[in-house]
A protein has these predicted regions:
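N-terminal cap/lid segment of alpha/beta-hydrolase-fold proteins
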Residues: 529-572
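Short beta-strand element of the alpha/beta-hydrolase
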Residues: 571-583
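Active-site glycine-rich loops that stabilize anionic/oxyanionic intermediates
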Residues: 581-586, 597
Length: 814
């Protein structure tokens, strides 16, 4: 009997192990259906850059999706940076694999001679006179700088010393001169990792509040500090026709900006102590003006670490910020200071003041103007015009003022909600002044400016436009607008007097291409490029922007894709995949606005849900998930779960009522905050058959100083954080959920442990869950094999739990 009993136990153990092992897959990479793989790997249209004169077009091919083997190469992750230890460059880049030129007038294309045989180019920039083009070339052990002569179409390497591009890129000084940072020592002599630390790592705080977000890839040890200093210390060099001259001493540069008259530099250098709490851009720093030989002329600021910056929307450190040169003067630096001790809720008439200091920088700073909200920047024009922007993130408000530099007078031109897309006037059209700086272009004797809006949101969908704005009447007149049935926007104003435009035009069936358009002469549009459709798999797939309402009357939209040849009467209702990302609004009217256009060509990236329309699914992409403040006393997130549920119910209902979506076979998915949304919907409703949640944060106690636009802390809104955390309701998640996360996620708040713990919590309560950890991936995925495997995992999840799910009674929200 004992033997039989023992044998029975062995059989049970074997069966248990078999089930467990089968659930783990075999660990190898899988491919999705061919149509999906072909679309992912399709060669995209070239990227385009046009010179200032509108004569030449530079076209480039970008290599997407490197192999996982490339991602697996060594890297240091320190101070918010990811460093290639061999070449003083970022470790993760998408490189340009081909460069060529096209004459816009003739349409003739030109091959570039002298390019490296294996091109890994980046940072392409035109020279001031548009006769040359510079780019970087990255190899395994160094970064070089090349210059293309546009007239001869020849490229030549111009540097003698390898570049260091970790703390900034090269800049054109003039048509024959470039400034760049160089490596000061071979990467091969980087500090070796000690066999053991000298002692424990210690962090301290003595009475100062430091409410910082949960940044990733931070400095964690004295060895990290050594590496940061080694790799980021660089020598500034001036290169004149290939001859290099050192400028100043090696330093850890934060930024280098050349004055419009080319006589000075505005330099920020980082200094110790290096922070273990914030990334490099938050380290202590010096702000100084130097001459072009690197000699200090004026010390402007000695800034502390950002560790003690106050938390909350629109709060800032009590230090000068926003240092920059005025574009309309030879050498005048400007900056901003808070007038409210850095706290926006302080009751003061003005919250910021902007100051200036002109060369030779030996006078007292001059106050230019004050702002009633937070200063957001200025666009310079001439001696009588500049446009000053101010706003409040917390109140979703922005304001543009006219500033007269000669008199100091300011006048409000417009104020709007940042979420009110319909009222967005666009941005000013600029032109280059005598110093080669972009300044506002004025028309009609200086009474009007041109405004370009490449989105052009409207109740009919996005219709980009070019308008004139009257500075006196404060009214806009549309000069040109994209025709309904297409999506076309102004890329460049080629000739303002003739109103000759370079535009980019597309429809839902026609790939984006570039056109020359003459509004005054009303000539027929001339097509400049002839890019072809990379996705024949989507031919005859239908796309429409659908409009519907949720229970409280808020209007919603989404982009509905239906399979090729689908007929609702013949084929019946389809399984549905809804992809979304929540957004907060203070205004229900703003939330209800139409966003996007059904007439845009569908361009796919690695994260798209549209792939699955080729596999027989109705895909509702960009399904709107607004979270709206319901009163002045409430913030949007106070009703997060209820509004999320209403949004989902409305989407399912409209697809069901249209006769295209089977409400009993619906999946929901999202990335990042969309993953957070997905987990919450599965925790609090019974609307879905499955969920796909990628790179999300599920436990809000791990993001205690705010997330997204929520600026209340965990301790100020403990119940809110608890209610919004799907981790706290993991025992309620019985709907199958696929969790995906990059194992090296570098996004604030979305540490991989969020998905790891969510998986364990759901598993521990008997839920159906799978966790896919993608090796070497960040918050956005890059590795070819990883992405193909992820697309296949999503496909098999949808097939198993949605398309082929057993039909049950109609799904209810609760």
């Amino acid at each position: 009997m004992a033997t039989k009993h023992f044998s029975f136990i062995v059989v049970l153990i074997f069966l248990h192990l078999s089930v467990t092992l089968n659930a783990q897959d075999d660990g190898s990479y899988k491919m999705p259906p061919k149509a999906i793989a072909d679309m992912l790997l399709a060669k995209p249209s070239p990227t385009v850059s046009v010179d200032d004169k509108g004569e030449w077009m530079l076209l480039t091919d970008i290599s997407l999706y490197p192999s996982v083997e490339e991602l697996a190469r060594p890297e240091f992750r320190i101070a918010g940076m990811r460093i290639n230890p061999k070449n003083y460059a970022p470790s993760r880049q998408n490189f340009i694999s081909n460069i060529w030129l096209k004459n816009i007038r003739s349409g003739k294309e030109y091959k570039i001679n002298g390019l490296p045989s294996s091109l890994f180019a980046g940072s392409v920039n035109w020279s001031p006179n548009n006769k040359k083009i510079a780019f970087t070339q990255t190899t395994k052990d160094k970064v070089d700088l090349y210059v293309i002569d546009v007239a001869t179409q020849k490229a030549m390497k111009v540097n003698k010393t390898a570049l260091n591009v970790l703390r900034g890129n090269y800049q054109w000084y003039d048509d024959n001169t470039l400034l760049y940072l160089t490596a000061i020592r071979p990467a091969s002599i980087a500090p070796p990792k000690p066999l053991m630390p000298k002692g424990p790592t210690t962090q301290e705080n003595y009475g100062k509040a430091s409410p910082r977000p949960t940044f990733q890839d931070l400095i964690r040890s004295p060895y990290d500090e050594q590496l940061f200093e080694f790799y980021n210390t660089a020598q500034l060099v001036k290169n004149v026709n290939g001859a290099e001259t050192k400028i100043g001493q090696p330093a850890i540069y934060g930024s280098i900006n050349i004055s419009p008259d080319k006589k000075y530099m505005l330099v920020r250098t980082l200094k110790k102590p290096f922070s273990y709490v914030v990334p490099a851009q938050g380290f202590p720093s010096h702000i100084v003006i130097t001459d072009m030989n690197g000699k200090a002329v004026k010390q402007l600021a000695d800034l502390p670490s950002a560790e003690t910056a106050p938390g909350g929307n629109d709060n800032v450190q009590l230090v000068p910020r926003g240092f920059d040169w005025r574009d309309d003067e030879a050498a005048t630096v400007i900056w901003c200071m808070p007038l409210d001790s850095g706290f926006i809720k302080k009751n003061v008439d003005y919250h910021d003041a902007v100051y200036s200091l002109a060369a030779p920088f030996n006078n007292e700073p001059l106050e230019l103007f004050k702002t009633k909200m937070r200063y957001r920047g200025v666009t310079w024009g001439n001696t009588t015009l500049a446009l000053v922007n101010e706003g409040l993130q917390g109140k979703q408000t922005t304001q543009t003022n006219r500033y007269n530099p000669s008199t100091g007078e300011t006048e409000k031109l417009m104020e709007r909600n940042t979420t009110d897309a319909y009222s967005n006037p666009g941005f000013p059209v600029t032109e280059k002044n005598q110093w080669g700086q972009e300044v506002i272009r004025l028309i009609d004797n200086g009474s009007k400016i041109l405004m370009n809006n490449p989105t052009g949101s409207s109740p009919k969908g996005d219709l980009p436009f070019l308008a004139s704005f009257d500075l006196i009447t404060k009214k806009s007149d549309i000069i040109w607008r994209s025709k309904e049935g297409s999506f076309e926007y102004v890329v460049k104003l080629m000739d303002a007097d003739k109103l000759e435009l370079l535009t980019r035009k597309e429809t839902e069936k026609e790939v984006p291409n570039y056109f020359l358009k003459n509004l005054k002469l009303k000539l027929a549009d001339r097509q400049i490029t002839d890019f072809t459709d990379p996705y024949p798999q989507l031919d005859n797939v239908s796309k429409q922007k659908i409009k519907y309402k949720r229970a409280d009357g808020v209007d919603l939209t989404g982009d509905l894709y239906l399979p090729k040849g689908y007929n609702a009467n013949r084929d019946g209702k389809l399984p549905v995949f809804i992809w979304a990302y929540p957004a907060e609004f203070n205004s229900a009217a703003d939330a209800a606005q139409v966003r996007g256009s059904e007439h845009r060509f569908t361009l796919l990236n690695w994260g798209s849900a549209v792939y699955y329309v080729t596999q027989g699914y109705a895909v509702l992409n960009n399904a709107e998930m607004p979270i709206v403040s319901t009163s002045k006393e409430k913030k949007p997130n106070d009703d997060f779960i209820q509004q999320l549920t209403m949004n989902a119910e409305a989407a399912i209902h409209v697809l069901d009522s249209m006769g295209v979506g089977d409400r009993n076979r619906v999946a929901v998915g999202g990335h990042s905050y969309g993953a957070f949304m997905t987990a919450n919907l599965l925790a609090h409703t019974k609307l879905f058959k499955a969920g796909i949640a990628r790179s999300g944060a599920y436990n809000r106690s791990l993001t205690p100083f705010g997330f997204q636009n929520e600026d209340r802390t965990y301790w100020q809104a403990l119940q809110l954080y608890s209610d919004m955390s799907p981790f706290n309701y993991a025992d309620k998640i019985k709907t199958p959920i696929l969790l995906v996360h990059g194992e090296m996620d570098n996004n604030t708040g979305t540490f991989p442990i969020q998905s790891e713990r969510m998986f364990n919590a759901i598993k521990g309560h008997g839920g159906t869950v799978k966790y896919l950890s993608l090796p070497y991936e960040s918050h956005g995925y890059q590795g070819r094999e990883n992405i193909l495997h992820m697309l296949n995992e999503q496909f098999t999840w949808l097939e198993k739990y949605v398309k082929n799910a057993e039909k049950k009674e109609e799904k209810k929200a609760f």
